[in-house]
Amino acid sequence: MMKARMLVLLSLALGTPSVVLAQAPVQLKFSRVVDLTLPIESNMAPIPGLKPYLNNPSRVNVISSITEAQKEALRAEGMTLSGDHEVNGRSMISVLSILVHNGTHIDAPRHMVENGIPIDQMPVAQFVKEGVLINLPGKEPNSVVTVKDVAESGVEIRPDTIVMINTGWTDKMWRKPGFWEQMPYLERGVAEYVANKGAAGLAIDVFPEKPLWRGVKLDPGEVWIANHLALMQKNLPLIQFVTNLSQIGNNRFTVVAAPLAIKGGEASPVRVIALVE
């Protein structure tokens, strides 16, 4: 636990490779840091029935270790050792293979919009914003997060904030049977409601669309990716499968969501933290 409040001055910049527009420094005061990110590991739970997930399981392959003792410790921790793993006396080295939409990740507009902005071209200032937390911990398995839930939560969605919706599902069910099969989901219109309030993005701990893999049907004329589109057509990011949101409490906080700068990419794994005042 930190004994004193910390003051961090972040100077953010926006621009293109040829033009950089300096912004005024952003002053952030916080007393603690909450990690909102699921760990990346081998065999992360895929969305049932979706081939991109099933055909591309996550892998963290350790190809070398320093000593035999380290190798056995890694094995005991559940790490995946490559078939050609070697003990080299020098260094541990790993190779990561992951579908970029697995675990805690951020979607850029290019994910759902043909000419959308790729993840590496989104302004980095868009990933450091004041956060707004909407707690909906009473959501039961297979339930729906509705526009009414969000509108009547008593939480003001301020412009230029990242809205975070907490059902507690990922905290309770990650790595457990039923994680996908009973997961609550967002009603069509939730993301549009948030975007129309002037939010800078949306972060959630569940899947944002109807779970077709368990037989939930679309309404006539309904587009399955409606919540994705509501954000991405406005160049707003969508962050999925955050965790530990309940640790923020009722405090003001700043969200820092740092994706990898994957050239031309539509999404990225992301380390999300909350700087809590």
Where are these regions (language model features)?
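Bacterial N-terminal signal peptides that target proteins for export
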Residues: 1-8
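Bacterial N-terminal signal peptides
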Residues: 8-17
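Active-/binding-site microenvironments in catalytic and ligand-binding cores
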Residues: 22-277
